[in-house]
């Protein structure tokens, strides 16, 4: 199949998942076309079967804000016609779904079938999408999609709860490349540099938005640090980073907390971490459990092994099969 993938090129979850999906589809013999305003950060290798098409937005004095959605629609149409795409897969509803719908309708006037699938990732539904000015457009764009997926049962339920969506939403979870994870070996030199006295390393990765409750990460680490030596790695960037850095200074944790910034490959740091800590509004990890896992090696090992066993259910090659089945289903109906 010739598949167009539209995503944000950033370090956020939707962009990473979309890029990794395209890379696996490429390995399985499909032709993949990425469409975005920048090259996706996780798209580092190119071949004859993978393409990147940049959306260029012209700036005119008349427009206070550049018309990105129109430029995106035009690029979708251009790529669909020039490369004879079979379908388009848009990740994150705003504004990709409405742009895809416009492109589909314009191409239909020329006798070209251009089905699109919308994947809902999170804040496009739970936060941003609930804005009264966005909701009618998002609802209509989702309902007009030829296929709709959500990355979790929770997100599907939230979509039905807050939007007038009539379309069937299929849950296809996020995935990880187990082969790549298992191939990454712990870097002892890196670990010793971060934790020279063998302190357990705690890691957080996010886009540092308010919903991630970044300050709570710091306060939790302070409680852990009061009981035992530890190091905290804060990976990523976003609007809450400066506030978190100031909090670290105020709590005198500056020698134990490292703000790494944006990095392409997180596996090496995760491999040397004892705990991955999340405190987002819709995700949580109990402080008492965190401390106990850090202190009791046998319990941590059991937790670790159970996590590995569970993660095998989300291997990229298995999950991508679900997307392929969705593509084939959509194409059979147009």
Can you describe what each PLM-predicted range is?
Residues 245-261:
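Nucleotide-activated donor-binding/catalytic signature segment of Leloir-type glycosyltransferases, i.e.
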Residues 61-88, 97-98, 102, 132-136, ...:
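An amphipathic, basic-hydrophobic alpha-helix
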Residues 195-221:
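Conserved donor-binding/catalytic core segment of Leloir-type glycosyltransferases
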Residues 262, 281:
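Aromatic "clamp/platform" in nucleotide-sugar-dependent glycosyltransferases that forms part
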Residues 181-196:
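A short helix/loop element that forms part of the nucleotide-sugar donor recognition site in Leloir-type
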Residues 299-313, 325:
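A short, well-ordered alpha-helix in the C-terminal region of glycosyltransferases
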Residues 7-11, 23-68, 169:
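N-terminal strand-loop element at the rim of the active site
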Residues 154, 175:
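Carbohydrate-associated surface elements
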């Amino acid at each position: 199949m010739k598949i167009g993938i539209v995503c944000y090129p950033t370090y956020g979850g939707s962009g990473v998942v979309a890029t990794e999906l395209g890379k696996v589809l490429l390995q399985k013999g499909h032709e993949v076309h990425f469409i975005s305003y920048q090259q996706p950060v996780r798209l580092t290798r190119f071949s004859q079967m993978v393409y990147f098409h940049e959306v260029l937005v012209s700036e005119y004095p008349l427009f206070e804000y550049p018309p990105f959605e129109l430029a995106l629609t035009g690029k979708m149409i251009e790529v669909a016609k020039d490369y004879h795409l079979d379908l388009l897969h848009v990740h994150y509803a705003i504004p990709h779904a409405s742009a895809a719908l416009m492109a589909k309708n314009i191409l239909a006037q020329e006798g070209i079938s251009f089905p699109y699938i919308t994947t809902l990732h999170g804040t496009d539904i739970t936060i941003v999408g609930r804005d009264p000015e966005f909701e009618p457009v998002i609802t209509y764009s989702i309902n007009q999609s030829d296929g709709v997926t959500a990355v979790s049962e929770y997100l599907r339920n939230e979509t039905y709860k807050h939007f007038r969506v009539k379309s069937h939403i299929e849950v296809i979870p996020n995935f990880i490349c187990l082969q790549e994870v298992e191939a990454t070996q712990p870097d002892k030199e890196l670990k010793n540099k971060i934790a020279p006295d063998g302190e357990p390393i705690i890691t957080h990765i996010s886009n540092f938005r308010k919903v991630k409750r970044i300050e709570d990460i710091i306060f939790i680490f302070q409680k852990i640090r009061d009981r035992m030596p530890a190091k905290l790695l804060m990976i990523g960037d976003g609007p809450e980073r400066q506030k978190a850095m100031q909090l670290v200074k105020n709590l005198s944790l500056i020698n134990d907390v490292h703000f790494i910034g944006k990095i392409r490959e997180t596996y090496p740091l995760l491999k040397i971490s004892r705990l991955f800590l999340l405190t987002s509004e819709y995700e949580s990890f109990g402080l008492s459990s965190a401390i106990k896992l850090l202190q009791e090696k046998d319990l941590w090992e059991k937790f670790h092994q159970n996590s590995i066993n569970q993660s095998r259910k989300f291997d990229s090659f298995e999950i991508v099969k679900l997307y392929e089945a969705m593509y084939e289903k959509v194409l059979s109906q147009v």
